[in-house]
Amino acid sequence: MIFLIIFASTIIIEKTMRLLLISNSTNFGETYLAWACNQIEFFCLQNNLKKDSRIVFVPFAGVNIAGKAYPESYDAYEARVQKVFFEKFGFENFTSVHHFEDKVKAVKEADCIIVGGGNTFHLVAEMHKYGLMDAIRERALAGVPYIGWSAGSNVACPTLCTTNDMPIVQPASFKTLNLVPFQINPHYLDPHPEIDKMIKHGGETRQDRINEYLAVNQQMVVVGLREATSLWVTDGKMMLKGGKKMIVMQYGKEAVEIEPNTDVTFLLGGQQA
């Protein structure tokens, strides 16, 4: 099958970039980050991160962690992720960026940047507020490893427009890190008309919402990342990892399903696949 990808804007993909873009932190019925641990560990080893490497965590999507409102929720979020990174991977220098007075400086000195999931609108608003959008982009382009899940994957895209979240705040801009030239819809859920009929749900499906976006942004590509899948960008190439297919959508074209563990570098530059 020939699938031509056409992008609205051109992004030069730096071969130095190291990105791990994860759809979701936790699978139903599992402990926090359990499914992703092997991927995160291998990614960290691949990028020569040591136990004393400076890991900076961005918690701003976590507005209601453990039933606490922010900023207290940031502490709870940090503790939750820090526990996994210490117990599973042995990292000892893990700090949330909200503790730093000079947040841009903290990012510039980081050996690895992690952006957690939650509400994408709040995350983007705070990243713009503190000048982190440009700072993180600069570091990622320079080769500093970047790990994001859910909202943290959303912000690696040109905009936040394919988030699933409620707009609980108004960011200064919908523009995000622009590290990849396509949009990600994390937690992508296939339509289930039989379930909708059973529960008498008459609202839009995820596919309906994405079609709305594509109708207005006809030159863009949307990648639906299903649960327990991720995209790895390294050495100028991109791989789909995990146990499920990925769906690639573009206006006026039939959606394409891509098998797991497939090279999807074509999405980075508009080649044919």
Where on the chain are the PLM-derived regions?
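C-terminal and late-domain segments of enzyme folds
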Residues: 18-50, 60-62, 66-76, 162, ...
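Alpha-helix C-terminal capping/helix-to-coil transition sites in glycosyltransferase folds
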Residues: 108-109, 142, 179
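Catalytic-core regions built around general acid/base machinery
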Residues: 130-143
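Short, Lys/Arg-enriched N-terminal segments with co-localized hydrophobic residues
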Residues: 2-16
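Catalytic nucleophile loop
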Residues: 114-117, 140-159
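Portal/gating segments that form or line small-molecule/metal binding sites
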Residues: 62-128
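Structural motif
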Residues: 21, 112-116, 147, 183-184
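A residue-level signal for conserved active-site and pocket-lining positions in enzyme catalytic cores
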Residues: 55, 113, 150, 184, ...
